[in-house]
Amino acid sequence: MVKLRLKRMGSKFNAFYRIVAADARAPRDGRFIEELGYYNPFSKDLKIEKELVFKWLDLGAKPTETTKTLFKKEKIMEQYHQKRQKN
């Protein structure tokens, strides 16, 4: 199963995260399939490639709770559900 989750990057006490599509069996900071964006909790900087997220959700990927919260902040889940209802 593919999950949309955060991959921890940066140094000790100065972490930032990449939003990635990864196999659920892979380690948190290990191998991933595709990078979808990034999130920096210190500067509150968030960038997400919406079209890539929509592609992975269509393919059946499951977002983790944390990534789902970030997607809701950017209204990505709402846009995805509206897009699916149109089709």
Curated annotation (Swiss-Prot):
Gene3D superfamilies: 3.30.1320.10. The keyword Iron does not apply. GO terms for cellular component: cytoplasm; small ribosomal subunit. GO terms for molecular function: structural constituent of ribosome. InterPro entries: Ribosomal_bS16, Ribosomal_bS16_dom_sf. NCBIfam families: S16. Belongs to the bacterial ribosomal protein bS16 family. This is Small ribosomal subunit protein bS16.
